[in-house]
Amino acid sequence: MELRSFSRQPDGILANPRLGREEVLEGEHPQDARLARQSIWLSPSLIAEYIQLFFNFIIGTIGLSLAIKFILMIRNDVNLKLEHNVREELDKIATCKSRYFENQCEPHMRVPALEVRCNEWSKCMNKEIVSGSDYQWAKAWARTLAEVINAFFEAFSIRSFLFILISIIGIIFVTNTSFGSYRVYLNNKDTKSVRHA
């Protein structure tokens, strides 16, 4: 009884290491045995897939980083505007308070001619500042976003914006189509060589 040593190839083909390069086991196709011996890293189709994956990863990373930078920029602008609004409100309150006391608007010293103004200054100086409420925050976001979009479209014409957009989409489309066509070409080439063998 003779024991034969077989090894299983990555694609499931059984190969006998004692057989020569051109010899194959019964039931195996010569093309399958040859392909099983090839290194997977030498496959042009696989290399093209990895290059395409790397290209798409780079494009996605650039797009994601630009989106994150845009959001962070707007968030910083919103925070600055909210701080500016709070400072303005504090200045108004300080002005109202100084006018209230300069004009002697305390109820027991108030002059009847200044009754309306004193009431306005009293409301103004007792106003409570709510910094960073959801309403103020949403309003500041909308205002800042509108300003950024307006500034962007004032700097660029519609033609230049469309040109940039179409160029970016075109580069991505052409590159992915080229890699896909190259893989189809390689697969067709491999199937033709199998038919001729």
Curated annotation (Swiss-Prot):
GO biological process entries: lipid homeostasis; mRNA transport; nuclear envelope organization; regulation of transcription by RNA polymerase II
Transmembrane regions: 54-74, 161-181
Keywords attached to this entry: Membrane, mRNA transport, Nucleus, Transmembrane, Transmembrane helix, Transport
Compartment(s) where it occurs, according to its Swiss-Prot or TrEMBL record: Nucleus membrane
Location (main, coarse): nucleus
InterPro entries per UniProt: Brl1/Brr6, Brl1/Brr6_dom
Cross-referenced SMART domains: Brr6_like_C_C (SM01042)
Entry superkingdom: Eukaryota
Any single GO CC term annotated in Swiss-Prot or TrEMBL for this entry: nuclear membrane
The keyword Transcription is annotated on this UniProt entry: no
Stored Pfam families: Brr6_like_C_C (PF10104)
Membrane topology: Multi-pass membrane protein
Entry GO MF terms: chromatin binding
Similarity comment: Belongs to the BRL1/BRR6 family.
Subunit-level organization: Interacts with BRL1.
Comment field (misc): Present with 125 molecules/cell in log phase SD medium.
Function: Required for mRNA nuclear export. Involved in the nuclear pore complex (NPC) distribution and nuclear envelope morphology.
Protein name (record): Nucleus export protein BRR6
Organism field: Saccharomyces cerevisiae (strain ATCC 204508 / S288c) (Baker's yeast)
Record gene name: BRR6
